[in-house]
A protein has these predicted regions:
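N-terminal pre-ligand scaffold of iron-sulfur
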Residues: 1-33
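Ferredoxin-reductase
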Residues: 97-184, 202-203, 242-244, 265-268
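Short, surface-exposed secondary-structure boundary micro-motifs
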Residues: 50-53, 89, 141, 190
Length: 326
């Protein structure tokens, strides 16, 4: 089996064999690169090849023809065929090591007819650390689904998840019709690189969410609340979108001095607040996009639209962080 060296532009490097993706090998070597789904669907791990040869593990349908021609690949979906130089730096943060552990359902709270909050209880001896914004995979009957943790700290060895009922969803039948307290499941995590990056050059923090995409945004907001030194002199905006009033099942409670919350609905006729889509409502606000950071979680459509619209207003590519539900 051949093994190759993968180089980053900040002079770090790691080894990767011919059967392992660039992303998986990086994480195995404690090199933190952007990622989310591991399934070549979300674009989070997009990276540019400056030199070297790689091969796709599966057909890739996310990147545009222009991106491919420019040398972009999804690091979760390519294996090396030579030494490779990537046009990327590592995240300069040590990610908590994912672990697979049993867990039990502590309780299930119905928030709306289609949304529940599930509280999972971890074994007493498990020390579970995560960055606010990360997610876990719930494993049942050999299948897995991803859910974002909706809080910033693991207290009493409990994790809380917002879960939506999707018609035909693989786990929806279980969560909404079968699940009960003390059910035994397995969990893998924490996963993903959706978390707050403290950038002293940014003056505004913009949080965008649709539906249960509010979960990691809520976690990040709690983190900012508990560490006010991270947001001194920064304005924080939260735009949370849904179709109907019942979709806004959570109310932010924060004492941050420069915080603005704008709920957005698209199909509520009697709604007196902002109507439309979160990215479009955000554009109507006096936000200095050239000096802003954006954290977006929710539908792929929202995230792709937000990145395009906001970049046209001056938002820097490196200041847009997203976690798409795929």
């Amino acid at each position: 089996m051949s093994t190759y060296t993968i180089y980053l532009k900040n002079d770090k490097s790691y080894s990767c064999d011919e059967n392992t993706s660039l992303l998986r090998a990086a994480l195995d070597n404690d090199i933190s690169l952007e990622y989310s789904c591991f399934e070549a669907r979300c674009r989070s791990c997009r990276v540019k090849i400056l030199q070297g040869k790689v091969e796709n593990l599966q057909d890739e349908k996310v990147l545009t023809a222009e991106e491919k021609a420019a040398g972009y690949v999804l690091s979760c979906n390519v294996v090396p065929r030579s030494e490779v130089i990537l046009d990327v730096e590592d995240l300069a943060v040590k990610l908590p090591k994912p672990q697979v552990t049993p867990c039990k359902i502590n309780n299930i709270t119905v928030l709306t007819p289609n949304i529940v909050e599930v509280v999972l209880r971890l074994p007493p001896k498990i020390v579970f650390q995560f960055l606010p914004g990360q997610y876990v995979d719930i494993i049942r009957n050999g299948q897995k689904r991803s859910y974002s943790i909706n809080h910033s700290q693991c207290e009493a060895n409990e994790l809380r998840l917002f879960i939506r009922n999707y018609e035909g969803g693989l786990f929806s039948q279980y969560w909404f019709n079968e699940a009960k307290p003390n059910d035994l499941l397995r969990m893998e995590g924490p996963l993903g690189t959706f978390f707050y990056r403290n950038n002293p050059n940014c003056e505004e923090i913009v949080l965008l969410a649709t539906g249960t995409g509010i979960a990691p945004i809520k976690a990040i907001l709690e983190q900012l609340q508990s560490t006010p030194e991270l947001t001194t002199h920064k304005k924080i905006w939260l735009f949370w979108g849904g179709r109907k009033k019942e979709d806004l099942f959570w109310q932010p409670k924060t004492t941050l001095p420069n915080f603005t919350y704008i709920p957005v609905l698209s199909r509520e006729e009697q709604w007196q607040g902002a109507k439309g889509y979160v990215q479009e409502i955000a554009l109507q606000q006096p936000i200095h996009w050239q000096k802003a950071q954006v954290y977006a979680c929710g539908s792929e459509v929202m995230i792709q639209s937000a990145q395009k619209l906001l970049s046209e207003q001056g938002l820097k590519e490196e200041n847009f962080f997203a976690d798409a539900f795929v």
